[in-house]
Amino acid sequence: MRLLLDTSVLIDVLRLRHGRRELLAELVRAGNTLATTALNVAELYAGMRPEEEARTESFLDALDCYELTAATGRLAGSLKNKYARRGRTLTLADTIVAAIAIERRCTLMTDNRKDFPMPELDFYDLPEA
């Protein structure tokens, strides 16, 4: 399984919360691939504490990182537009992450499922944080 880690999970791993580091280690041992997006990396750096820099770099180096392509951008924009027409406001960041997960056929690992209403998405069932 290819897991796409959302920012909430990345932060939990780096701040040693909720046993997320151990969970990811177990998933890797079981043969799963861990990835994130360049957008999640930007969000992580935006809130990073100075003392977390080395640990953050080391952790991110161990992950695959998916970029935003023109095709992904079109899908993300279409998703945002589709839900806006239904009266649901989604952030562009979340629609980009969703589009990458859909295009790359990744299972999304997030604490914020409510931000990702797309039925095309598969989610990893995280234990309660």
Language model: regions and residue ranges:
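Nucleotide phosphate-binding site architecture
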Residues: L10-I11, A42-Y45, P117, Y124
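Acidic, PIN/NYN-like endoribonuclease modules and their adjacent C-terminal/linker elements
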Residues: A98-A129
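Acidic catalytic patch
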Residues: A42, L63-R85
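Short, well-structured N-terminal submotif of metal-dependent ribonuclease cores
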Residues: M1-T36, Y45-D61, A129
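Donor nucleotide-sugar recognition loop
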Residues: R88-L90
